[in-house]
């Protein structure tokens, strides 16, 4: 699967495809916008443009009749038409603005929904900052394109074509001269647009990379500070800031040159046309009123042509955003509801000859087989990096085995819907995730239905967490801060255990939390875990000797393989490495 720079290269290589009408329409359809607003906005823009096109046509006879006096009524009508055109154009801008906001709202909702349904392996290879950039910057770029650039380009093209049509009716020779000059201007525009397209893609990719680095450092700000790594973090970001600066300079040069070059080309063309018009007047082919009317149409062209050119520039800049969003929405996501619903209680969990590797990298697990009988405790022990946590990831179905299968009561777990499976699995890790919000919100996170305060206090009791929650100023409504920074490590663990009690899982997975806790917190957490394990099928990554001794079966894992299994006393007698590991590595619990 292509990610990061590979994705950027892939998009750059297919820029034309990604900005094609087919892909663009696909992206807009995904947003499900309010098409009525778009239609009303475009129609209002068309009406405003048509009114604007009528004004120069009315000026022609008005000027030619000045020799017989000023017609106040016609002058007032011309002014009224200008005001009417401005009013209708304002209405069009407002309606299209609302349309654009509806598009970006729906698109962000769709992109966010897609992100949270992507498999875990996607997030292993894409920085969160890049994902945030897709959600914020790329969607805004698309909104600007469809709410501003496209409608303005549409009305400008209408103004351009309408002006040319009326000019042909008024004086075809002068208009023909302009039609000959237009391709010259387009030849000047083409290389500029190509350069703008390249800058736009590079800018979006660099910005996403910078946001990824910033998000990573800020999310781990305590590590940054405790490690005195501020200089390192600044230097790491400095390269990306400098890269963005260089791209910004190129973009500034591009934006700075774009308008003057286009305006110069337009003015040279217009000057030549005006000179030719004066010549036609001098030969009696054209009247002064016709020339003034033509000049007003030319003023329309001066405004319309740069707008059309800017549209192509914005389209070029948005090509990277459009490509990334389209590719993201095309990613295969997890299907939560596909499969059977099965009650896991009282059923045997088994793994048979399971292998696993991340993509094409070195194999992590080799020929893993184990069995967990109902209500039994299965312990996984072994040196760090052996693959114990990977087994848990496979059980949570974050990844698929590359060989072998995992079954429940003889049935492959892939046959069970993800939602049903995960709703019956509970996991408490060494550093359990706590979300920003209240204690109440964290306890009920991911659960449907209403829970009374009594329900919550009951699970807090079971997790030995009631006392510290009662002592907090707002109790269940206390804010715990981002990632639970306002509470201690032991308190976070006990809240996670209380959350697991509330979920009432049929299969429990534990990564014993001992290393980062003081002895008192560890004792409280262990009591809560012991209570949680009762009456459930439990798989535990063991760090305590008491857990090893109490386990119904132990699997010793080293370098991705099970090298021994059995009860504690059996392994001590038959497995020298296990005996050494127990004596040197495990915490002795009371």
Swiss-Prot record:
InterPro entries: AAA+_ATPase, ABC1_TM_dom, ABC1_TM_sf, ABC_transporter-like_ATP-bd, ABC_transporter-like_CS, P-loop_NTPase, Type_1_exporter. SUPFAM superfamilies: ABC transporter transmembrane region (SSF90123), P-loop containing nucleoside triphosphate hydrolases (SSF52540). ATP binds at residues 382-389. GO terms for molecular function: ABC-type oligopeptide transporter activity; ABC-type xenobiotic transporter activity; ATP binding; ATP hydrolysis activity. It comes from the Bacteria. Residues 349-584 form the ABC transporter domain. It is a multi-pass membrane protein. This is Multidrug resistance ABC transporter ATP-binding and permease protein.
């Amino acid at each position: 699967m292509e990610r990061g720079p590979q994705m950027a290269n892939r998009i750059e290589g297919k820029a034309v495809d990604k900005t094609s009408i087919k892909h663009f329409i696909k992206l807009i359809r995904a947003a499900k916008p309010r098409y009525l607003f778009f239609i009303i906005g475009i129609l209002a823009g068309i009406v405003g443009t048509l009114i604007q096109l009528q004004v120069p046509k009315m000026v022609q006879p008005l000027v030619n009749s000045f020799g017989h006096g000023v017609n106040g009524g016609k002058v007032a009508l011309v002014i009224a038409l200008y005001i009417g055109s401005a009013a209708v154009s304002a209405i069009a801008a407002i309606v299209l603005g609302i349309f654009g906001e509806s598009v970006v709202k729906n698109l962000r909702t769709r992109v966010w929904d897609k992100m949270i349904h992507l498999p875990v392996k996607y997030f292993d290879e894409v920085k969160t900052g890049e994902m945030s950039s897709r959600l914020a910057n790329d969607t805004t770029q698309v909104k600007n394109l469809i709410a501003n650039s496209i409608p303005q380009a549409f009305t400008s093209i209408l103004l351009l074509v309408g002006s040319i049509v009326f000019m042909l009716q008024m004086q075809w020779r002068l208009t023909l001269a302009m039609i000959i000059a237009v391709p010259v201007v387009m030849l000047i525009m083409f290389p500029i647009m190509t350069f703008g397209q390249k800058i736009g893609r590079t800018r979006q990719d660099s910005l996403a990379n910078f946001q990824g680095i910033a998000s990573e450092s800020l999310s781990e700000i305590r590590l940054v500070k405790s490690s005195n790594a501020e200089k390192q973090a600044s230097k790491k970001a400095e390269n990306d800031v400098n890269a963005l600066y260089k791209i910004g300079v190129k973009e500034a040069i591009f934006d700075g040159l774009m308008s003057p070059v286009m305006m110069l080309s337009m003015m040279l063309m217009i000057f030549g046309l005006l000179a030719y018009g004066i010549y036609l007047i001098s030969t009696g082919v054209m009247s002064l009123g016709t020339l003034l009317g033509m000049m007003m149409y030319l003023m329309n062209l001066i405004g319309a042509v740069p707008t059309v050119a800017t549209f192509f520039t914005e389209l070029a800049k948005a090509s990277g955003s459009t490509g990334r969003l389209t590719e993201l929405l095309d990613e295969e996501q997890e299907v939560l509801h596909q499969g059977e619903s099965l009650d896991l209680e009282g059923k045997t969990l088994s793994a048979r000859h399971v292998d696993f590797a991340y993509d094409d990298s070195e194999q992590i697990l080799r020929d893993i087989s184990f069995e967990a009988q109902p209500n039994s405790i299965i312990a996984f022990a072994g040196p760090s990096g052996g693959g114990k946590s990977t087994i848990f990831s496979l059980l949570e179905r974050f990844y698929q085995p590359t060989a072998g299968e995992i079954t429940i009561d003889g049935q492959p777990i892939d046959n069970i819907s993800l939602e049903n499976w995960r709703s019956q699995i509970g996991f408490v890790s060494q550093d359990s995730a706590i979300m920003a919000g209240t204690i109440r919100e964290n306890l009920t996170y991911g659960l449907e239905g209403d829970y009374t305060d009594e329900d919550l206090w009951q699970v807090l009791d079971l997790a030995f967490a009631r006392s510290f929650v009662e002592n907090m100023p707002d109790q269940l409504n206390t804010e715990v801060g981002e990632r639970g920074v306002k509470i201690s490590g032991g308190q976070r663990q006990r809240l996670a255990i209380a959350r697991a009690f509330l979920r009432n899982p049929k299969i429990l997975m534990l990564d014993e939390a001992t290393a980062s806790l003081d002895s008192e917190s560890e004792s409280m957490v262990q009591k809560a875990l012991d209570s949680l394990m009762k009456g459930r099928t439990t798989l535990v990554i063991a760090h305590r000797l008491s857990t090893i001794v109490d386990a119904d079966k132990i699997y010793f894992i080293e370098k991705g393989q099970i090298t021994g299994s059995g009860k504690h006393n059996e392994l001590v007698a038959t497995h020298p490495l296990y005996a050494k590991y127990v004596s040197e590595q495990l915490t002795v619990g009371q």
